[in-house]
Amino acid sequence: MQVENIRVRLPSGKEVGLVDALNFCYDISDTDFQVLKTLLNSGPKTEDELAEMLHLSKASINRSVNKLVSLGFVDRVKDSSSKGGRPRYIYKPIDADRITTKISNDFKYCADLFSSVIPQELKEK
């Protein structure tokens, strides 16, 4: 599944999109990004609902929501209507503004880190 997005032309001439940058910084795949966008646009969902909406396997959805939870973009809440057996979870995105701020801050942090090592790397023999 390819996520369509705005492309940015880098000084090298290469064009990259947001998913490329998210993949570099967070190891987020196209599928992970599609799951996040779906949750942001459609509200909290279970894995089953996401699998049906996105026409993906539950295993694929499970990997994506676990990645998004570990990164702090999505909260996992136990479904109170779940009776017996394995607990069901509902996945709820954090506020879109918080996600935007987190990603922007992390991009700035990464850029600053790379900028700080350039002088050292250029001087080393």
From Swiss-Prot:
A Pfam entry, by short name: TrmB
Keyword Repressor carried by entry: yes
Keyword Transcription: yes
Keyword field: Activator, DNA-binding, Repressor, Transcription, Transcription regulation
Gene Ontology molecular function, alphabetical: DNA binding; DNA-binding transcription factor activity
Transmembrane parts of this sequence: none
Positions of the DNA-binding region: 19-38
InterPro entries named in the record: ArsR-like_HTH (IPR011991), HTH_MarR-typ (IPR000835), Lrs14 (IPR053795), Tscrpt_reg_TrmB_N (IPR002831), WH-like_DNA-bd_sf (IPR036388), WH_DNA-bd_sf (IPR036390)
Record's subunit section: Homodimer.
Function: Acts in transcription regulation. Binds to multiple sequences in its own promoter.
NCBIfam families: trans_reg_lrs14
Protein's UniProt name: HTH-type transcriptional regulator lrs14
Recorded name of the encoding gene: lrs14
